[in-house]
Amino acid sequence: MLIWKQSNGIFGKENIMQKKGHFWKVLSCILITVFFIPSAVVAGDKVYKMKAESVYGPMSKTTTEGLFRFLDLVEEKSQGKIRFQRFSSGSLAKAKEALDALEVGMFDVLLSYPSYYAGHVPEGQIFLIPYLFKSMKAIYDLWYNTEVGTMVSETFREKGSVILGPQFLASNVVATRKQISTLDGFKGLKIRAPGGVGSKTVETMGAVPVMLVGAEIYTALQRGTIDGYVYPLYSTWDYKFYEQAKFIVQPSLGYIITFIWMNKRTFDGLPSDLQKILMDAGKEHAAYLLDWAQKSDEKIWGQLATKGVKPVTLSEPDVNNLVENLKARVWPTYNQNARCKKILDICIKHEGWE
């Protein structure tokens, strides 16, 4: 009996162990069902893989803060349903051809500067107009709270691209190799300009515009090919332009506003919820960059001071003279069609220039 009981006990323990093993198997199945089936469902959703390019270098703040941070935001908000392969330095298409390349479908997303495409979409030049806008906040307000954003966006849609949002990056400054204390001092100087309105601005100042991409500026300064440049304030620090040009003219010409575009066919092919995510992310990112750019300008001025860079402020009569000349010669050049004129009129009224 004892042996049987022991034997029965052993068999009973094995039976209990078998039941426990079965229990854990069932529990494991339940846990797998709870935790992994939703992932399988997500994995079964369509993932939209896109190519995104910045025409600027991989370490440029225009690329890292302007584009890559936006791409991160979209990937997060879409829960991975939109994913980006990232390119920079114009590796998919050079700056001046990049918008055309985007619109024919060579890639899906582009960050670039609208002045490169002045002949393609003149309406996109509005934020390049010098001295028109009194703050970056004013530009944000014009884009999202007036007809300006809608009208500019419509023009690009007609060409085959969708603006996902404006990018606020920095003050737009003129820096020179030698100190220029008066407006007359610009006469005959060769100043790098981005084209379009930027080139007309340089001409109005009495200088000669030279069209160069950002990567060529340092060497051109070093060789004396140019005497100065129009470019974002932060570039003077980031690209060490202060080694060649230590004088920054004040007040600034305006502000650097780039756009992020998406190929229209790509955008139209997305579900409505993902389209909304893209546009919402664009507005959120614009608000972030507005704050970031203002703080960045303050920080950069402090850093440049340690390298001997000096702001050179034009006299009030020179500034007034320059503004009047710009209003007469440059601002009206934006009015290439009725839509341009309406956009400019809204901006002039908004900024109190009437």
Segments predicted by a language model, with ranges:
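N-terminal secretory/targeting leader peptides
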Residues: 13, 44-139, 147-148, 154-354
